[in-house]
Amino acid sequence: MEPHKKFLFLVVVGGRSPKANIELHDVRWVIGSKIEDTFDQLRNDWFGSYNELHIDSYKKIESIDGYKINLRNKENNEPKNKIFKKRKFPNKKLWFVNIGGYDPSSMQEKHEFGFVVASSPSEAKNKANSKWLIDSQKKHTDDIYTVKSFTDVDECEVIKNINDWEIELIPNGNHLEEKNIPDWFGYMRIDKK
């Protein structure tokens, strides 16, 4: 691994909020060379109490749907990848999709989420629906964001600026489906520096 190479991480964080009766969770996408580099950003983005703030799982995202994820720091004027400049790609974007659904034997709404590469919100929803919560009833899309850069989203709430990183999608030719399985899961406290 290159010493300062940055990666996109998808992180599930958990914690408490003063008026909540149960532990709450959120999903964040952050950038760092290693997961520990993202802790400050995760703490800053958390909406509840810092006490007992923790990571439940994370995954380093390197490729999605046959595209390599390349990160470019716009602030440092890093040049775009040569392959990206030479070829015209369809208007593909990286989307985060959160699918909800129900199981009649459970009180809670089930969720499955992750990234897909698609040209439009409807294509992103269709891809996610074809992969996730296959056996759930009343399946629906709870959240969908396009993640072009970490300062832009598609007609939804604003994603906080994360060091002005831009995402380049580079076809990697392997078309292997990257499994939506965490690299790590458990209980990792991040409430204290």
Model regions: which residues?
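Surface-exposed interaction/gating patches
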Residues: 80-137
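Structured beta-strand/turn binding interfaces of compact recognition modules in eukaryotic regulators
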Residues: 14-16, 33, 100, 119
